[in-house]
Amino acid sequence: STDTQYFGPGTRLTVL
């Protein structure tokens, strides 16, 4: 699955 993690405004990391 995919999971999008937000660390701050305009910052995100998508983990496959």
UniProtKB/Swiss-Prot annotation:
Keywords: Adaptive immunity, Cell membrane, Immunity, Membrane, Receptor, T cell receptor. The keyword Membrane applies. Its main location: membrane. GO terms for biological process: adaptive immune response. GO terms for cellular component: T cell receptor complex. It comes from the Eukaryota. It is found in: Cell membrane. J region of the variable domain of T cell receptor (TR) beta chain that participates in the antigen recognition. Alpha-beta T cell receptors are antigen specific receptors which are essential to the immune response and are present on the cell surface of T lymphocytes. Recognize peptide-major histocompatibility (MH) (pMH) complexes that are displayed by antigen presenting cells (APC), a prerequisite for efficient T cell adaptive immunity against pathogens. Alpha-beta TR is a heterodimer composed of an alpha and beta chain; disulfide-linked. The alpha-beta TR is associated with the transmembrane signaling CD3 coreceptor proteins to form the TR-CD3 (TcR or TCR). The assembly of alpha-beta TR heterodimers with CD3 occurs in the endoplasmic reticulum where a single alpha-beta TR heterodimer associates with one CD3D-CD3E heterodimer, one CD3G-CD3E heterodimer and one CD247 homodimer forming a stable octameric structure. CD3D-CD3E and CD3G-CD3E heterodimers preferentially associate with TR alpha and TR beta chains, respectively. This is T cell receptor beta joining 2-3. The gene is TRBJ2-3.
